[in-house]
Amino acid sequence: MLTEIWADLMQTFVLAAVIVAVEAYFCGCFNGAVIVSKYILRDDVRNHGSGNAGLTNFYRTFGGPLTAVVILTDVLKAVVAIWIGIFVIESFFTNEPTLTITAVKYWAGLFCLLGHMFPCMFHFKGGKGILSGGTIAIMIDWRIALVVWGGFLILTVLTRYVSLGSLWAGASFPFISWYCYPDPVIVVLAFACGGLVVWQHRANIKRLLSGTENKFSFHRKK
């Protein structure tokens, strides 16, 4: 009897985890830069600049008030992905401890990032996950958000290299997560999230080392 109960519990847990992963991934697929540029401006942002479907490349290429739409889209999809994830878990399991809800946020956040970076509806060519990732950090814990966003803003302002601030965000995320939540599952998920962000910036790392990386400017290139 006990074995059957545990088996049913594991099946329910796996089902809930899969549902959260799928919904978070498809939320992440709604890439603001691609949607606005391709369907509103009729000029895919991935055909310009760095070829990245992210906020920085969109601003450098198009600028204008539609940048706010890109920001709003990438922020809201991360919020929705995590909210739905929490709702799913609470629907399957009642009175879940805080640590479990936190782990769900990381799980949903990871798949939201995967959807943003590799969107199936846009030929798996998406962004680098900084804005969505930063939103996920805020949703998880203000202490994590403070370290991630604080370092990002300081480095970006001082050096004008958005990529350098982004690398800080990706690299610091797992370590501050480890400090705040020394749980093996959470640490693994945090390293997966941070590792994805750093990996997506591998070309930027090469340009930073060679001194050819573009600096951010509020005046977009014509």
What do these predicted regions represent?
Residues L15-I40:
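N-terminal signal-anchor transmembrane alpha helix
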Residues A16-V20, L66-V70, L76-M121, I140-V147, ...:
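Nucleotide and nucleotide-moiety/phosphate-recognizing core
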Residues N57-G64, G85-V88, F111, K128-T159, ...:
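Interfacial segments of multi-pass membrane proteins
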Residues V34-T67, G126, K206-K222:
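Cytosolic, membrane-interface loops and tails of multi-pass inner-membrane proteins
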Residues M1-L15:
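Short, strongly hydrophobic alpha-helical membrane anchors
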Residues L146, V162-A169, Y181-C193:
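Loop-to-transmembrane alpha-helix initiation sites
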Residues D43-L55, M121-G134, Y161-A169:
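Short, non-helical or kinked segments that cap or interrupt transmembrane helices
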